[in-house]
C-alpha cells in the first residue's frame, strides 16, 4: 500500500487511487494521453469504457482530482481524438471552468490519408486533439516558435561580402529623417523607380522564427523503425512532448502523467530538468518507462 507519494517515482496502480493520495496544489503540468474509448482492445491496453456517458462518468472523479492537485499557475493537457474530445471538453468546462479553457490543439500526426481509390463514406482521420486548460488565469505559458519556411529564408540572397551577412531589399514603410540618414550613410538604402524606399534587411538581425498556431503539422507520429520506438501501441514522439513541456512548464516544475503508457512524457520531463510523477495500471508500461529513465544520460 502506498502511504506517501514521492517525487520522481513511477507507480503501477489505478490512477484514481494515486490521485486521491496526492497533495493539493502540488503539480505544475499534467499531460495525459487518455483512453479514447474507441471500443477496441489493443495489445497494451483496453480502450473500452462503454457509452460516451459511461466514459465521462469514469473520467469525472479523475478530472476533479486533477483540478485539486494542480497549482494555481498549472496547466493540464488531455490528448485524445474525435471519439471523446467533445465529451471531454464539456466535462472540463464544468470542472475547470469555461474561462480556463485555453486551446484545442490539432496535432496532424500523419500525412498519409490512404489510397485515393479506397472506398469509404467519410474522410480519413490523420489528427489527434490536445485539450488544454489552466487552473487559473495566472498560468505558465512560454510561446513556442518555429522557423519560417524556406520560401522566406530564400529571400536573403544578397551578400556584399562586407561582413554584414546575407540580406534582401525590404520595403521601408515608416521612417524618420534620422533613420533615412543612417541607412544612407551605411549604404543600406535605395530609392525605387516608384520613389519609395527599400532597405537592406539582414538575416542576422531578422526574426527568423514565427509563433506557433494551434495546428501542429510539423511533428510526425513514430514509425515502427524509429530509434525512439519501444514497441508500445500509440507511443507518442518525444518532439511532441518536448514542445508541450517547454510551452507550459519551467525547469524544476512537477510534471505528472496518469496514463503514462510508454512514458514519453516522463522521459522528456527528466531530460528537460523537471520533476515527475508517472502512473499506469499496466506493469509493462511501468517496466518500459523505468528502463527508458535508466537509459537517460543527463548532460551526456
Predicted features, each with a name:
Residues 1-290, 294-298:
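Core catalytic lobe of class I
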Amino acid at each position: 500500500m502506498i502511504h506517501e507519494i514521492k517525487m520522481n517515482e513511477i507507480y503501477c496502480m489505478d490512477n484514481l487511487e494515486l490521485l486521491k493520495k496526492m497533495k493539493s496544489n502540488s503539480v505544475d503540468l499534467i499531460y495525459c494521453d487518455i483512453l479514447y474509448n474507441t471500443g477496441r482492445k489493443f495489445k497494451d491496453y483496453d480502450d473500452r469504457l462503454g457509452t460516451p456517458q459511461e466514459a465521462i462518468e469514469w473520467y469525472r472523479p479523475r478530472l476533479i482530482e486533477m483540478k485539486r492537485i494542480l497549482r494555481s499557475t498549472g496547466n493540464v493537457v488531455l490528448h485524445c481524438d474525435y471519439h471523446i474530445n467533445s465529451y471531454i471538453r464539456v466535462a472540463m468546462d464544468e470542472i475547470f471552468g469555461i474561462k480556463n479553457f485555453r486551446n484545442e490543439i490539432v496535432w496532424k500526426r500523419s500525412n498519409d490519408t490512404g489510397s485515393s481509390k479506397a472506398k469509404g463514406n467519410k474522410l480519413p482521420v490523420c489528427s489527434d486533439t490536445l485539450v488544454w486548460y489552466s487552473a487559473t488565469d495566472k498560468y505558465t505559458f512560454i510561446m513556442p516558435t518555429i522557423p519560417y519556411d524556406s520560401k522566406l529564408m530564400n529571400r536573403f540572397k544578397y551578400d556584399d561580402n562586407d561582413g554584414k551577412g546575407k540580406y534582401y531589399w525590404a520595403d521601408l514603410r515608416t521612417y524618420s529623417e534620422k533613420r533615412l540618414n543612417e541607412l544612407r550613410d551605411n549604404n543600406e538604402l535605395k530609392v525605387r523607380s516608384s520613389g519609395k524606399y527599400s532597405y537592406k534587411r539582414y538575416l542576422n538581425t531578422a526574426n527568423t522564427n514565427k509563433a506557433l498556431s494551434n495546428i501542429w503539422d510539423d511533428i510526425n507520429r513514430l514509425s515502427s523503425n524509429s530509434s525512439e520506438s519501444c514497441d508500445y501501441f500509440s507511443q507518442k514522439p518525444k518532439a511532441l512532448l518536448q514542445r508541450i513541456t517547454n510551452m507550459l512548464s519551467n525547469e524544476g516544475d512537477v510534471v505528472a502523467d496518469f496514463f503514462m503508457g510508454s512514458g514519453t512524457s516522463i522521459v522528456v520531463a527528466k531530460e528537460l530538468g523537471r520533476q515527475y510523477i508517472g502512473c499506469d495500471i499496466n506493469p509493462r508500461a511501468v517496466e518500459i518507462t523505468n528502463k527508458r529513465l535508466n537509459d537517460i544520460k543527463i548532460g551526456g
